[in-house]
UniProtKB/Swiss-Prot annotation:
This is Ubiquitin-like-conjugating enzyme ATG3. InterPro entries: Atg3/Atg10. The lineage of its organism: Eukaryota, Metazoa, Chordata, Craniata, Vertebrata. One of its GO terms (cellular component) is phagophore assembly site. GO terms for molecular function: Atg12 transferase activity; Atg8-family conjugating enzyme activity; Atg8-family ligase activity; enzyme binding; ubiquitin-like protein transferase activity. Cleaved by CASP8 upon death ligand binding such as tumor necrosis factor-alpha. CASP8 cleavage blocks survival-related autophagy and favors apoptosis. Conjugated to ATG12 at Lys-243. ATG12-conjugation plays a role in regulation of mitochondrial homeostasis and cell death, while it is not involved in phosphatidylethanolamine-conjugation to ATG8-like proteins and autophagy. Transmembrane segments: none annotated. It comes from Homo sapiens (Human). Belongs to the ATG3 family.
Length: 314
């Protein structure tokens, strides 16, 4: 029944998006939404600091006129996912509801205190000092190499707790190594010894109706065979399956449909973060949008280890 409702909603939103005019004037600070131009600026900032993310065009017939042809959406491929969500130790103490007084019951952050998605707490430490000069401290090993070339100053910010993410010098994961590792584990015997590593392709598009970024993902098994929808749901927080996360067609690519994190709450969450930064005497630049966006959607896909800023300063 929920799938039917999501399908009907999806079709209605497609029509609404088509009829919605393109946002021309910036309303980022007031409402948390962004223009297509601001989306491109934030995307350029993400690509600069995390080169595993790249701009893409998609199908020619699906190019959106309000975005540059070569910058229709962002993509990162072969992102590792080492375990299923049910394998993560759950505790009520780790759960938090963001904006719980809204009609939908709020955004559930299942791993709120683990350091994976502590963005709303961390931004309280941001100050006015060097607020316009931002750089990453630990996006990944590759991002660190990029930072060696950056000479801009940046004020320190309290580091997030490490979440046990596997560091790698590779921009993308070599799935052949995963297969070899799986075979070795299988030979060792025992179901628990098997490395159940999957990989995901992630995409960020601009949603004209909600005027925010939108995250899409599609997964593969160890043999690089596409995962079924039910298998992909295993890597998504169960608080968000079929609610925040639905199955829809990518706006720039051909089928099959992908999992998508619905953007209806993105502007609200971003507005809350902007206000929190302002309360601390800081100012959040729109070019930081996607770095922070990737931070808070990690609550939805906590085991997919994509390239984003775990440590950043302002």
């Amino acid at each position: 029944m929920q799938n039917v409702i999501n399908t009907v909603k999806g079709k209605a939103l497609e029509v609404a998006e088509y009829l919605t005019p393109v946002l021309k004037e910036s309303k980022f600070k007031e409402t948390g939404v962004i223009t297509p131009e601001e989306f491109v600026a934030a995307g350029d900032h993400l690509v600069h600091h995390c080169p595993t993310w790249q701009w893409a065009t998609g199908e020619e017939l699906k190019v959106k006129a309000y975005l540059p042809t070569g910058k229709q959406f962002l993509v990162t491929k072969n992102v590792p996912c080492y375990k299923r969500c049910k394998q993560m130790e759950y505790s009520d103490e780790l759960e938090a509801i963001i904006e719980e007084d809204d009609g939908d019951g709020g955004w559930v952050d299942t791993y709120h205190n683990t350091g994976i998605t502590g963005i709303t707490e961390a931004v309280k430490e941001i100050t006015l000092e060097n607020k316009d000069n931002i750089r990453l401290q630990d996006c990944s090993a590759l991002c660190e190499e990029e930072e060696d070339e950056d000479e801009g100053e940046a004020a320190d910010m309290e580091e997030y707790e490490e979440s046990g993410l596997l560091e790698t010098d590779e921009a993308t994961l070599d799935t052949r190594k995963i297969v070899e590792a799986c075979k070795a584990k299988t030979d060792a015997g025992g179901e628990d010894a098997i490395l159940q590593t999957r990989t995901y392709d992630l995409y960020i598009t601009y949603d004209k109706y909600y005027q925010t970024p939108r995250l899409w993902l599609f997964g593969y098994d160890e043999q690089r065979q596409p995962l079924t929808v039910e298998h992909m749901y295993e890597d998504i927080s169960q608080d968000h399956v079929k609610k925040t996360v639905t199955i829809e067609n990518h706006p720039h690519l051909p089928p099959p449909p992908m999992c998508s994190v619905h953007p209806c709450r993105h502007a609200e969450v971003m507005k809350k973060i902007i206000e929190t930064v302002a309360e601390g005497g800081g100012e959040l630049g729109v070019h930081m949008y996607l770095l922070i966006f990737l931070k808070f959607v990690q609550a939805v896909i906590p085991t997919i280890e994509y390239d984003y800023t775990r440590h950043f300063t302002m």
